[in-house]
């Protein structure tokens, strides 16, 4: 019985263990002044794929007019991005770990394929998160505005989705009360 109780306790602890964001996320977050767990949770939402039984952000991800595309290499992703740009309005194309929008953030990169550099993409995503955050407010509100600066229901849906990733990374559970409170605070 004692062994069973110990095993159950270990399983419960493992289910809520904190996941440390990889060093690249920590560095980009530190430079921008945002929590690394927030940046990592956003990347999980934006470009996450299942690999070896875990969800991980994928650097060579594109979203073109609502359709997700994953590539094996940066070169393949760049070719896919260039092809998409010939036929799709740039405001309908997102690229990289943080799914940076080509049209709305064109001032942040020199060449569209720069967004497929994981370090550059994370730096831009962290900058956007920082710009959307107001001192003293919950980071979930900034997360919603990262997705949709105008707020509203699309931002609230995005917040709810990212909050699940954030809770996993932080080793906590998202509570219904917290999600409702975040929803009520949003414009």
Residue spans for each PLM region:
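N-terminal signal peptide c-region/cleavage motif recognized by signal peptidases
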Residues: 12-14
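Acidic, Ser/Thr-rich low-complexity intrinsically disordered segments
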Residues: 181-187
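Sec-dependent signal peptide recognition
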Residues: 1-7
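Catalytic glycan-binding domains that act on GlcNAc-containing polysaccharides
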Residues: 18-175, 187
């Amino acid at each position: 019985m004692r062994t069973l109780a110990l095993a159950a306790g270990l399983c419960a602890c493992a289910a809520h263990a904190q996941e440390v964001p990889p060093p690249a996320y920590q560095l980009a977050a530190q430079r921008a002044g945002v929590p690394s767990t927030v940046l990592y949770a956003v990347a999980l939402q934006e470009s996450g794929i299942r690999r070896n039984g875990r969800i991980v952000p994928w650097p060579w991800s594109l979203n073109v007019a609502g359709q997700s595309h994953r590539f094996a290499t940066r070169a393949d992703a760049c070719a896919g991005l260039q092809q998409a740009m010939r036929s799709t309005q740039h405001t309908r194309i997102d690229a990289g770990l943080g799914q940076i929008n080509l049209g709305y953030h064109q001032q942040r990169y020199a060449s569209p394929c720069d967004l497929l550099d994981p370090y550059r993409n994370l730096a831009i995503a962290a900058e956007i998160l920082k710009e959307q955050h107001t001192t003293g407010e919950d980071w979930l509100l900034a997360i919603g505005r990262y997705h949709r600066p105008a707020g509203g229901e699309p931002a609230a849906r995005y917040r709810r989705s990212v909050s699940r990733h954030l809770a996993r990374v932080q080793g906590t559970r998202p509570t219904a009360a917290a999600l409702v409170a975040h929803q009520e605070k949003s414009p």
